[in-house]
Amino acid sequence: VGFKAGVKDYKLTYYTPEYETKDTDILAAFRVTPQPGVPPEEAGAAVAAESSTGTWTTVWTDGLTSLDRYKGRCYHIEPVAGEESQXIAYVAYPLDLFEEGSVTNMFTSIVGNVFGFKALRALRLEDLRIPPAYSKTFQGPPHGIQVERDKLNKYGRPLLGCTIKPKLGLSAKNYGRAVYECLRGGLDFTKDDENVNSQPFMRWRDRFLFCAEAIYKAQAETGEIKGHYLNATAGTCEEMIKRAVFARELGVPIVMHDYLTGGFTANTTLAHYCRDNGLLLHIHRAMHAVIDRQKNHGMHFRVLAKALRMSGGDHIHAGTVVGKLEGEREITLGFVDLLRDDFIEKDRSRGIYFTQDWVSLPGVLPVASGGIHVWHMPALTEIFGDDSVLQFGGGTLGHPWGNAPGAVANRVALEACVQARNEGRDLAREGNEIIREASKWSPELAAACEVWKEIKFEFEAMDTL
């Protein structure tokens, strides 16, 4: 009983247009740009093969297992409108190919090898459908949106944050001072920048201590619960957990992690620690644009966002739609819903390729951050709704009178927008008017309005359908 050695087309084994997808399959939508002369079926089948059981030639050991049970299958290919050389290849992966509770393993399988494949000019993972059978093997966010609101006792409005700038170079004492001023002025949170870890000018332990002091002082004076995202990201998992432990000992409510540079294994480790110890977890997406910005190669951010919800985080940066960083409105709202909601219908107009049912996995608060200021407040309130965190770094610290008045201006603008919305006014149409009215009785807001009245970041978004 020999076996038929040699090389055969992938599509003979891995292109199965008659396949009915199972409820337990992980489904992927790839944007495939094959090399000239490679038919789309072969390219799609090659992706399915190389990201599951296949290799470039038939091997004797194939006979020792059931390929039909374990192989990925390219089950549908559709052309991309307006792109002659591209196709969307849909691939179904049997659940048994993946280790339970490991985003790391999921990505190693699905995107680990196949992106360097010679038969393809480019490849982009546009979306993943995670079946409940797989998502139930993950803890997910340490707490989720409702528990966070209960812990912070803040309801019926977006939360306000501010990244402390200059991001590098402040001493711990001065850093803590800036934190105190912002929280005292009316913000809910302040934030370590993503690259503030533990550098010579400010070691992590000193920063944690001075920030904790600032939090307690601001809480005592305002009667509100305050937080500062203490960045626990470090060079090793052990060091990261050590920092999280210290944050817990200080009694602060929230820590932070850079999940892409830190890696999914570290992130899931930290998320488990945070749930076990009552810490909220803020996630920064530093490095995401390296992966998601090219239209025809890499991975769309909605995939990274889904992966984060599985790995665990209570907040994640998700673009602004209006500020200085990337984000097209409908597409952004698509993955914002994927982060917050339990059940999201397939909607290609928003870039959502599959219906996603998260069952009981807690939701994540999207964070809008980057180049936003008081004039954006009505748009942000309208676009993101209550379940979001609006972060004004320069838009707080750049206030001509200083940090605390900058915080006051943002809080007044937010409360004015929320009140106007609750009274039934149209934020999209009357936004500027609402801000102007509020600035009449808030000199801090009036000063902020004056400084930023002309600022715009008008560039075409790259992230289009």
UniProtKB/Swiss-Prot annotation:
The protein's required cofactors: Mg(2+)
The positions making up the signal sequence are none
Q: In the UniProt entry, which residues are flagged as the active site? A: K165 (proton acceptor), H284 (proton acceptor)
Q: Which residues carry this modification: N6,N6,N6-trimethyllysine?
A: K4
* GO MF terms held by the record: magnesium ion binding; monooxygenase activity; ribulose-bisphosphate carboxylase activity
Other remarks on this protein: The basic functional RuBisCO is composed of a large chain homodimer in a 'head-to-tail' conformation. In form I RuBisCO this homodimer is arranged in a barrel-like tetramer with the small subunits forming a tetrameric 'cap' on each end of the 'barrel'.
- What is the official name of this protein in its record? Ribulose bisphosphate carboxylase large chain
